Amino acid sequence: MKQRKHRYQFPDGFLWGSSTSGPQSEGTVPGDGKGPSNWDYWFSIESAKFHHQIGPEKTSTFYENYKGDIALLKETGHTIFRTSIQWPRLIPEGVGEVNPKAVTFYREVFQDIIAQGIKLIVNLYHFDLPYALQEKGGWENKATVWAYETYAKTCFELFGDLVNTWITFNEPIVPVECGYLGYYHYPCKVDAKAAVQVAYNTQLASSLAVKACHKLHPDHKISIVLNMTSAYPRSNAPEDVKAARIAELFQTKSFLDPSVLGIYPAELVSILEEADLLPQYSADELEIIKNNTVDFLGVNYYQPLRVQAPSKSQQEGDPLILDIYFEPYDMPGKKVNPHRGWEIYEPGLYDIALNLKEHYGNIEWLVTENGMGVKGEEAFLADGQIQDDYRITFIEDHLIQLHKALGEGANCKGYLLWTFIDCWSWLNAYKNRYGLVALDLESQKRTIKKSGYWFKALSESNGFDK
């Protein structure tokens, strides 16, 4: 007997869309006035590190094709869309002169999105620092904080008549981990002291942007986007539970608590103090963080954080790394995306929703990224279309968990998939495809995948049957 399908209907006004970023989609055109970013510089000196040596200069050519791409937003059922302004495009040197071509470009993009009846969210920073500032120490240098504050104010002044919903930073912990505790973001060094200072300076910059936004546009909403992941211990043994708690302090609460609550977790401060890793800060700066919390929260969720107690302690003279507090745990029998290697754990989204409800005042939030990267997706091409049923299933199964959380009072207002059109993903370039729309790298032709048409039906009916 065929099992009857269940209807998952979402609240009226629930928003459906996707997220992308400037550096991953726009590309560079000769004469566009864009300055080099940290990624442009890194690619120029070490292109072999990038998959198939594809760098940030071409990406998905949104700069040239934005009108057609925005029409595709409508065709795939978007009611909300998040993109980012590239700081080095708008202010090529990071400070000083504004690039008028960038102003024209972004105003036209924003106007076209709004004209389609799509709610627009604009992010100010998606890992792309003007290289001129990186040369002077980047986020280790407080001067970058003040430069970012000026950049944010410039954006609010130039585009505030079009944009009323803003993001300060996307996943700010990622450059900290990958650039200062690893080798996946420039400047590629392992320096715990620098990592902590970069994290603190980024949070201060975010709080200053919130302050500036509220002063210039009191009716606007501003947020930060965090890759929030609950930490799951290997076992209930005290040492594993402690490792999970510390992992969550570093990976999530280091930005979540100051952004939403205005304070740093006492245990995190204590750990940093004990390790002689406290950043340079002032009482006035802590007041800025305390008094300028976000209006809502953006949540990115891909996979769970599974950890276990550390197997080794720090030896004298060794650089301090997070492995002395917790180690990754590879859980046997987990469900895995075979095309990407990441664990798929849909209840993680439900756990995040309940955490926000119970510990963060049930703050309003959006899922700002959730998606499935697939290597070699052309293997699923049939009848001129990528038959990505696996992506549809991935989205459905996460939405079931979100629907459950909404039924229990979670304050989530929308779901934004990563991503719209297959985009450039940093060192991985185009290795893994995430889009509702396929991109042919040779011709730059866009073709809606099966999931794109399914997503439109999801949006139009505000729910699905499964």
Q: What label would you give each PLM region?
A:
Residues 2-50, 93-95, 103-466:
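Active-site region of glycoside hydrolase catalytic domains
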Residues 36-71:
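Aromatic- and Gly/Pro-rich amphipathic surface segment
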Residues 55-62, 95-99, 144:
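Short secondary-structure transition/capping motifs
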Residues 61-68, 76, 85, 101-108, ...:
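Generic alpha-helix structural propensity
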Residues 65-86, 291-296, 359:
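Catalytic domains of carbohydrate-active enzymes, especially glycoside hydrolases
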Residues 85-98:
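Glycine-rich, proline-tolerant flexible connector loops at the mouths of alpha/beta enzymes
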